[in-house]
């Protein structure tokens, strides 16, 4: 199978590319290698598979319409996984326009590429952040997500709406995956686990927001990628029982679906930090701070639909996942 993966030098994208290549797929990776965080780790991720005979890499921006049209026309993919986006809830507060270019304009170019080139299935990264002001736990795809708390969250909700439009108008199968706090080896340096590990090893204090009372449904990278692959292999069907008088937000008569991919087991931030301290054999100096603008206190994924449709549920414990991350970190940075 020939697959375009956008964000191929990113955390989730690079891990997915390796899995697809390992099983024999042909992969065209797209990434703009921006400097949102240190590009060196992107290059290091890419180096693990850049010379694979079934891999082609393209350094282009999703917002570049001509380049994206050429990528689709040249390679004619059967499936597409969009993992490229301007990430970060907090960054979106100070840099909103970056999210429009990548997450809205760029996604429109992907949808157009799929539409005009006979793509069989588009899978794209949404986010748990779309649940916004909702506090009904666990978060279900059958709940409305109409109150985002950041432009990042709004852009991800917009992706879901744009995808539905294309599924409805052009019969393009699309599936959105709401990822819940992904962590693990080769992670993003701007995320808490990476920052905490660096600070603790250097004897620096760590900033703990919401006084450590956050609960997050931390989900290990390999569990995320396994979910992506299972979904990718089964193009989204329409829901024949969908009722327009009582519309279900998670399905449609069109070939459009949404799924949560989370560990279904939220962990308090202080417990997450304790697991990291145990893995490092060091105690963190903590600076307790209030909840930041745009953040939500808790996330908790209801994965019943994922289990029902794909017989799959993430299961890696925080302790095991953090131990694997720390082992990778110490080796990668030669600490």
Regions found by a protein language model. Name each.
Residues 66, 104-112, 190, 222-225, ...:
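Conserved active-site region of classical short-chain dehydrogenase/reductase
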Residues 40, 93, 173-176, 190, ...:
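Non-catalytic, surface-exposed connector residues within folded enzymatic/regulatory domains
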Residues 19, 200-335:
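C-terminal substrate-binding subdomain of Rossmann-fold SDR/epimerase-dehydratase oxidoreductases
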Residues 158, 162, 166, 196, ...:
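Hydrophobic alpha-helix immediately C-terminal to the catalytic Tyr-X-X-X-Lys motif of short-chain
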Residues 1-182, 312, 324, 328-332:
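N-terminal Rossmann-like NAD(P)+-binding domain of SDR-like oxidoreductases, especially those catalyzing
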Residues 137-138, 189-197:
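A glycine/serine/threonine-rich, flexible loop-to-helix segment
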């Amino acid at each position: 199978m020939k697959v375009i993966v956008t964000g191929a030098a990113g955390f989730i994208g690079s891990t997915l590319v390796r899995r697809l290549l390992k099983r024999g797929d042909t992969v065209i990776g797209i990434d703009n290698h921006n400097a949102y965080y240190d590009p060196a780790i992107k290059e290091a991720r890419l180096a693990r598979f850049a010379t694979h005979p079934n891999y082609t890499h393209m350094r282009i921006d999703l917002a570049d319409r001509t380049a994206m049209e050429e990528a689709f026309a040249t390679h004619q993919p059967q499936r597409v996984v969009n993992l490229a986006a301007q990430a970060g809830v907090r960054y979106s507060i100070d840099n909103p326009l970056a999210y429009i270019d990548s997450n809205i304009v760029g996604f429109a170019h992907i949808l157009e590429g799929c539409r005009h080139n006979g793509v069989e299935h588009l899978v794209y990264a949404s986010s748990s952040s779309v649940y916004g002001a909702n506090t009904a736990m666990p978060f279900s795809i059958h709940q409305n997500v109409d109150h985002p708390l950041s432009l990042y969250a709004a852009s991800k909700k917009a992706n879901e709406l744009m995808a539905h439009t294309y599924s409805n108008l052009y019969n393009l199968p699309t599936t959105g995956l709401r990822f819940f706090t992904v962590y693990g080896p080769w992670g993003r340096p701007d995320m808490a686990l990476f920052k905490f590990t660096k600070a603790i090893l250097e004897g620096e204090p760590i900033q703990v927001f919401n006084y450590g009372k956050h609960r997050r449904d931390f989900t290990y990278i390999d569990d995320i990628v396994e979910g992506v692959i299972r979904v990718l292999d089964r193009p989204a069907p329409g829901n024949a029982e969908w009722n327009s008088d009582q519309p279900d937000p998670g399905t449609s008569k069109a070939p459009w679906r949404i799924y949560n991919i989370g560990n279904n087991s939220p962990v308090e931030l202080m417990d997450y930090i304790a697991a990291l301290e145990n893995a490092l054999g060091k105690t963190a100096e903590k600076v307790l701070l209030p909840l930041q603008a745009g953040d939500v206190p808790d996330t908790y994924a209801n994965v019943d639909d994922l289990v029902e449709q794909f017989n799959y549920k993430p299961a890696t414990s925080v302790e095991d996942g953090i131990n694997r991350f720390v082992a990778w970190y110490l080796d990668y940075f030669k600490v």
